Amino acid sequence: MIELKFEDKVKVWRNLREELETNPHPFDLITRFMSTLPVSSRKSNAFDPSAQIQPWHLLENSSFTEYEIAQLYAYTLQLTDRFCSSKVEIHISKDIEKEELLYLVFLDGSIVLGYNNKATSIDKLPKTIVSQKVIVMPPLH
């Protein structure tokens, strides 16, 4: 997606959202897609409210911080009819065992996206993962 023109990126993103509407395994589909995005070496301060970027501006990027990927997960789900009424949160979390910062997307308090580039249920998340800040995503439509 990085080498595409902006208009083509919008089409790819729209096609993903359309496929999420009917796919029997939507969380596998979205995590596979997100795992193909290039991760930037840039750092963003996810604790700063101004670090949240609107969806269309995210698409302008050629690479993404881990926080931007979490935002893209959230926006993608919110802009589908299937998940538009779901509660979407970004959890800025820390694996206290590995001293690693994580940006996880929680859907309806039960599904976690982005942990090890997979979808998992909240009860299967290791107990060493501790949320440090929760960003509740406002509905988009």
Predicted regions and their residues:
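A structural boundary/capping signal
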Residues: M1-H141
